[in-house]
């Protein structure tokens, strides 16, 4: 289900405040956040945001193609190691 247009996208207030401060100062720092549910907005373009994946903060450089997506989409939480190989020789 999509969000109402009159409400606008969800962006954590503390994250939006930090980005606006950096835009005013014209600085590029890594912003650490746990807010995976925040939507990427155009003011974030060009910044590096470290998103928590459950173990560590993964730095993600925001580009224009990411606008409209959630931060959590780019910080994977699970690692797929692959299925076990079937070893026919050891079964004999």
UniProtKB/Swiss-Prot annotation:
NCBIfam families: rpsS_bact. The keyword Chloroplast applies. One of its GO terms (cellular component) is mitochondrial small ribosomal subunit. The keyword Protein transport does not apply. It is found in: Plastid, Chloroplast. GO terms for biological process: ribosomal small subunit assembly; translation. The lineage of its organism: Eukaryota, Viridiplantae, Streptophyta, Embryophyta, Anthocerotophyta. GO terms for molecular function: rRNA binding; structural constituent of ribosome. The gene is rps19. Protein S19 forms a complex with S13 that binds strongly to the 16S ribosomal RNA. Keywords: Chloroplast, Plastid, Ribonucleoprotein, Ribosomal protein, RNA-binding, rRNA-binding. It comes from the Eukaryota. This is Small ribosomal subunit protein uS19c. Its main location: plastid. Coiled coil: none annotated. Belongs to the universal ribosomal protein uS19 family. Pfam families: Ribosomal_S19.
């Amino acid at each position: 289900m999509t969000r109402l247009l009159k409400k606008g996208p969800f962006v954590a207030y503390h994250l939006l405040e930090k980005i606006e401060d950096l835009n005013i100062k014209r600085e590029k720092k890594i912003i650490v956040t746990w807010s995976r549910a925040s939507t990427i907005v155009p003011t974030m373009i060009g910044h590096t945001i470290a998103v928590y994946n459950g173990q560590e903060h993964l730095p993600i450089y925001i580009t224009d193609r990411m606008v409209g997506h959630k931060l959590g989409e780019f910080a994977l939480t699970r690692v797929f190691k692959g299925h076990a190989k079937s070893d026919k020789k050891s079964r004999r």
